[in-house]
Amino acid sequence: MNSSNLFYSNANSTLRLSYGNVKDYIPSDAIHYDYYTTIAGIIEKEDSTNEDFIVPKKLIDLYNDKNFGRYADSDGNLRVNFIDNNDITGGNSGSPVLNAHGELVGTAFDGNWEAMSGDIVYEQGLQRCISVDIRYILFIIDKYADAGYLIDEMTTVSYTHLTLPTSNDV
């Protein structure tokens, strides 16, 4: 180690700010990823023989009952994740994602594989930040964990007012 040298710190313990837009992702010809996923995708990938894809029965039941409550989008779907072109790095997992009005719309948790060079150079066409939609987080707290009392303790913005992620809105 060169203890006498100064190095830029990781995302830990420093204030970082990134901005971007919610966007679909088209990494190559004939491959297109929509800017959001829904709970239907979780159910479609369910595989009881693969530890990474086991879906708890209670979540399957909530899906089958379409018991999404106020967390459903205008089409009645429950969005789980969205992608945007924010510039993130290792250590950003859990960082808040705000919309243009300063409202919490999700939490960043990963980047896409094709943008692994993002720690060295930002590539707008490739770089995507994967975030958990705040509606899914609140749904899990309220409906899955039966901890609605925690939601009651929060000051939340009405979903009729909240500007939720759509293309060009983060």
Regions found by a protein language model. Give the residues of each.
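Conserved small/polar residues in nucleotide/adenosyl-binding loops
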Residues: 160-166
